[in-house]
A protein has these predicted regions:
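C-terminal structural segment of proteins
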Residues: 1-126
Length: 126
């Protein structure tokens, strides 16, 4: 196994996250369920990893015909939200069927939307 070094930065606010991520070779991390695996497999070798968990993007806003979800909301939290369960039950069902409880507890909604490469074999092949 080849070991390589990288810089880890914990961003406390959005300007700090943007500044840390502006350097070449930086990757943002929230749940890390994809990035950590890609780093282990040496598919990704970022020079800097920027932890964005301190940023305030964890809101879930349920309206009669709309759902707004912050990028840092965990899959578990979205699936368990009473408003989502009532108004958008198919989202709850999809989230609960999509991964193990351990992954759902770590994985962020934003990270799942922005996976590189996608984990879903369908999207990898299309």
């Amino acid at each position: 196994m080849t070991v390589y070094t990288f810089t880890f930065t914990k961003a406390e606010d959005e300007p700090a996250a943007l500044a840390a991520g502006a350097t070449g070779g930086a990757r943002y991390i929230a749940g890390g369920t994809t990035l950590i695996d890609l780093m282990r497999e040496t598919v990704e070798r970022p020079e800097r990893v920027v932890d964005i968990n301190a940023l305030p993007y964890r809101d879930i806003d349920v309206q009669p015909n709309r759902l707004r979800v912050g990028a840092l909301v965990r899959m578990t939290d979205l699936a368990a939200d009473p408003g989502v369960r009532e108004r958008f039950p198919v989202i709850t069902q999809a989230l609960e069927a999509s991964a193990s409880a351990q992954l759902r507890n770590m994985a962020s909604i934003g990270g799942n939307l922005l996976q590189r490469p996608p984990r879903c074999l369908y999207f990898r092949d299309v």
